[in-house]
Amino acid sequence: MHEAQIRVAIVGAGGRMGRQLIQAAMAMEGVQLGAALEREGSSLLGSDAGELAGVGKTGVIIQSDLASVKDDFDVLVDFTRPEGTLAHLAFCRKHGKGMVIGTTGFDDAGKQAIREASQEIAIVFAANFSVGVNVMLKLLEKAAKVMGDYTDIEIIEAHHRHKVDAPSGTALAMGEAIAGALDKDLKDCAVYSREGYTGERVPGTIGFATVRAGDIVGEHTAMFADIGERVEITHKASSRMTFANGALRSALWLKTKKNGLFDMRDVLGLDVL
């Protein structure tokens, strides 16, 4: 057993992402699985987290009460749903725990609650924890600065049939990266649906298209299209483990932070490129 630098609690431990996070925590140098949680009434309560995730017995028992494990972790890793994440945020703020938030679908009030909590605790909040996706966001900023003023920009994303929000948080982050590079607000230039007689494409807009099908882990493409040529920047994920590893890497990075709101570009040092 390697020496732990950070102890993590994983909420939603029985879900697809939760199990991957448990596997990643058990494998990553410097990380210790301190707690695993599921909703009250879940049939998984009382199970060993490692056995649930297929990595063998860990001695960490899945529980529903966050307060009962507050001394067992330093950073909470949350890939659940907005209402649950905000409740966990209030707990972590009260008890001085760091957070890694991969939940998507927050409204403006939820995002504001995260910003306010970050004045007291350290939070990494990202739409996508894949290293590749965050490199892509940096590439999109650079492409937008060169081509954004004269091309038609479209973002196409595809996910599995169980995803409940659209467009994906990553697609929105792509739009925000492009809009920011063009000194625009995404709210003012995004087009989220087209149906019926729409008229010609409005110049300067950023279009979004969504696919939900099968077991697609996540595919995102940004298109910069002109007459005679187009540039497409694409990322395809084939395993959730890429997100889990990025989230645990973020938890390790938080060990030296007392407070503040960060994203994966901070963790990876991409803003200096």
Curated annotation (Swiss-Prot):
Compartment(s) where it occurs, according to its Swiss-Prot or TrEMBL record: Cytoplasm
- What is one Pfam family matched by this protein? DapB_C
Residue positions binding (S)-2,3,4,5-tetrahydrodipicolinate: H160, G169, T170
CDD domains (alphabetical) = DHDPR_N
Give the reaction(s) catalysed: (S)-2,3,4,5-tetrahydrodipicolinate + NAD(+) + H2O = (2S,4S)-4-hydroxy-2,3,4,5-tetrahydrodipicolinate + NADH + H(+); (S)-2,3,4,5-tetrahydrodipicolinate + NADP(+) + H2O = (2S,4S)-4-hydroxy-2,3,4,5-tetrahydrodipicolinate + NADPH + H(+)
Which family is this protein grouped under? Belongs to the DapB family.
Instruction: Write down the HAMAP family for this protein, in alphabetical order.
Output: DapB
What is the official name of this protein in its record?
Answer: 4-hydroxy-tetrahydrodipicolinate reductase
Give the species: Salmonella schwarzengrund (strain CVM19633)
